[in-house]
């Protein structure tokens, strides 16, 4: 019973609200504020990986419990108001790092088509993920999602052109696949739109697994880069170019 998403969400929201000042909280205080029994609170704290004797959230633990709650199905709207944009970025970076991806953030790119900003460019093996992070106050309408796809298409074209220009492709080249992803706290209305992946942060690990298995069925751009150049080096060249 205590592990139901709505109960986990109720306690997590209370915890984020009361622990924002860094104070130590008791199980009794949390139970009273969240309208839960002491046993329920202790069980949920155990699920979230929080010691129940003295409840205090460091920044690192705060991000871990938010991620754990989202993975358990907690509604993102319950906790969105308690997360800064910086904390959302750190959540994304944590998931990417655990999955073995390198990443660079907040790339501002100029081209003949104009300027675009790339929130996250993540890379591992022969995959590069063009990630657009959205911190909506509510789930987006389908029309908003369609507009986001258009914006991602533009970023995709510009980034592909730029990467090919610095990759020294030609004889002895290899393929790298650039895949667009849209990420937010909320579950999207659809996980795919015109081949573009939409994912909540709580489902992001599963989305990464899916992308790695089926990227060739998704919207992607195939790049040719010099064989022997790692994506780390390619990203360094991109940084230098920008």
Annotated model-derived regions:
Residues 1-118, 122-242:
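Intrinsically disordered, low-complexity Ser/Thr/Pro/Gly-rich regulatory segments
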């Amino acid at each position: 019973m205590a592990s139901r998403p709505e109960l986990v969400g109720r306690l997590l929201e209370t915890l984020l609200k009361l622990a924002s000042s860094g104070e130590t909280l008791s199980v009794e205080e949390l139970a009273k504020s969240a309208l839960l029994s002491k046993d329920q609170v202790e069980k949920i704290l155990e699920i979230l990986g929080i010691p129940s004797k003295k409840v205090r959230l460091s920044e690192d633990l705060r991000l871990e419990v938010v991620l754990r709650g989202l993975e358990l199905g907690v509604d993102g709207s319950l906790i969105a108001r308690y997360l800064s944009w910086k904390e959302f970025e750190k959540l994304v970076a944590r998931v990417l790092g655990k999955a073995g991806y390198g990443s660079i953030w907040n790339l501002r790119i100029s081209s003949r088509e104009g300027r675009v900003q790339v929130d996250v460019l993540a890379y591992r093996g022969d995959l590069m993920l063009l990630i657009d992070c959205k911190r909506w106050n509510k789930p987006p309408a389908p029309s908003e999602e369609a507009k986001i796809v258009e914006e991602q298409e533009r970023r995709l074209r510009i980034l592909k052109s730029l990467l090919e220009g610095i990759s020294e492709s030609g004889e002895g080249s290899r393929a790298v696949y650039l895949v667009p992803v849209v990420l937010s706290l909320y579950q999207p209305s659809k996980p795919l739109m015109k081949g573009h992946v939409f994912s909540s942060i709580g489902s992001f690990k599963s989305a990464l697994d899916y992308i790695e298995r089926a990227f060739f069925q998704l919207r992607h751009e195939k790049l040719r880069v010099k064989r022997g150049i790692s994506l780390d080096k390619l990203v360094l060249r991109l940084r230098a170019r920008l």
